[in-house]
């Protein structure tokens, strides 16, 4: 399992002459598109990464991937619904209709849904756990991770300075 201590210095000092093709392959291998929009492709269940390079440094992007629950956008924060019988359901609200709440319980499958009767709800809390799993970089080596981050920062443009 990678740490920010291991990858942070490289994110600050080794972001030139990265490999675009490897970065693009790693973006696919790490399943980023399952939840994140990038250009004209990908999911809508996580933040759009197209302009991430204008908002985050390489260091910050690595920190977000290593620690996805550190900061969760309100737009993508799951909720935990506790029912009167103490059963719980977690997910992203996709529909509120009268006495019914529909949650997407699996962000990689938009059809995985649970309907909750609001009249039987004991409590609703915003989850402190990101739907983005930890360990997404575990199977990649350091060079592949840096190429992946360069790819995201570039917005998918091979002529970006990170690849020169």
Feature annotation, model-predicted:
Residues 1-28, 56-60, 86, 135-137:
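Electrostatic cytochrome c docking/interface patches
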Residues 42-66, 78-126:
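Gly/Gly-Pro-rich "capping" loops immediately C-terminal to redox-active cysteine motifs
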Residues 23, 27-39, 49, 148-155:
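The canonical Cys-X-X-Cys-His
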Residues 1-17, 38, 151-164:
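Post-cleavage N-terminal segment of exported redox proteins
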Residues 117, 121-138, 142-144:
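Intrinsically disordered, low-complexity linker and terminal regions at domain boundaries
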Residues 75, 95-99, 108-110, 126, ...:
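Low-complexity, glycine/serine/threonine/alanine-rich intrinsically disordered linker
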Residues 30-33, 99-101, 130:
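Glycine-centered loop/turn positions within well-structured domains
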Residues 7, 28, 66, 70, ...:
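Sec-exported extracytoplasmic/periplasmic mature domains
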């Amino acid at each position: 399992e990678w740490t920010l201590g291991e990858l942070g210095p490289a994110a600050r000092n080794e972001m030139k002459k990265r490999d675009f093709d490897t970065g693009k392959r790693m973006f696919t291998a790490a399943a980023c598109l399952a939840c994140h929009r990038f250009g004209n492709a990908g999911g809508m269940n996580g933040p759009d990464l197209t302009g991430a390079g204008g908002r985050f440094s390489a260091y910050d992007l690595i920190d977000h991937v290593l620690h996805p629950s550190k900061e969760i956008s309100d737009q993508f924060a799951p909720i935990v619904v506790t029912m009167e019988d103490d059963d719980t359901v977690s997910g992203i609200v996709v529909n509120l209709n009268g006495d019914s709440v529909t949650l997407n319980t699996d962000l990689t499958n938009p059809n995985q849904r649970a309907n909750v009767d609001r009249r039987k709800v004991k409590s609703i809390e915003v989850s402190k756990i990101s739907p983005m799993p930890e360990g997404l970089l575990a199977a990649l080596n350091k060079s592949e991770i840096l190429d992946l981050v360069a790819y995201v920062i570039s917005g998918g443009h091979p002529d970006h300075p990170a690849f020169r």
